[in-house]
Amino acid sequence: MAFFTGLWGPFTCVSRVLSHHCFSTTGSLSAIQKMTRVRVVDNSALGNSPYHRAPRCIHVYKKNGVGKVGDQILLAIKGQKKKALIVGHCMPGPRMTPRFDSNNVVLIEDNGNPVGTRIKTPIPTSLRKREGEYSKVLAIAQNFV
């Protein structure tokens, strides 16, 4: 038995390391960053027609590279590059801000006008604070959370 415990002695730390997570599980992994799959929630033709690959974020227009509600991102959708506005994400935020089941975006043009005419899901009321920037997106929203 002593031989058995002596044999596994150097490997106990290896098994201990392998049993724990060897990767980071921080909150930033749940926010929207590069290569995050998103869901388009407006009724634009580009966002509604089926495609074999989900839209992905390829750039976040922020210095730290992590997008939250109200930030602009660049999407790769059906072989095209389109700008989008984040209207909901899975990451828990500060108090009294909703957490969504999916990463929701609304397609916008380069000047900030929305591509679609309706938003199908509720959007957070925290976007109303930034009303000057996204007033046209708020105008086509039906529900607020």
UniProtKB/Swiss-Prot annotation:
Major site of localization recorded for this protein: mitochondrion
One cellular component (GO) term of this entry: mitochondrion
InterPro entries: Ribosomal_uL14, Ribosomal_uL14_sf
Compartment(s) of residence: Mitochondrion
GO term, biological process aspect, one: mitochondrial translation
GO MF term set: RNA binding; structural constituent of ribosome
Transit peptide location: 1-30
Keywords on record: Mitochondrion, Ribonucleoprotein, Ribosomal protein, Transit peptide
Function: Forms part of 2 intersubunit bridges in the assembled ribosome. Upon binding to MALSU1 intersubunit bridge formation is blocked, preventing ribosome formation and repressing translation.
Self-association and partners: Component of the mitochondrial large ribosomal subunit (mt-LSU). Mature mammalian 55S mitochondrial ribosomes consist of a small (28S) and a large (39S) subunit. The 28S small subunit contains a 12S ribosomal RNA (12S mt-rRNA) and 30 different proteins. The 39S large subunit contains a 16S rRNA (16S mt-rRNA), a copy of mitochondrial valine transfer RNA (mt-tRNA(Val)), which plays an integral structural role, and 52 different proteins. Interacts with MALSU1.
PANTHER family: 39S RIBOSOMAL PROTEIN L14, MITOCHONDRIAL, LARGE RIBOSOMAL SUBUNIT PROTEIN UL14M
Family listed: Belongs to the universal ribosomal protein uL14 family.
Designated name of the protein: Large ribosomal subunit protein uL14m
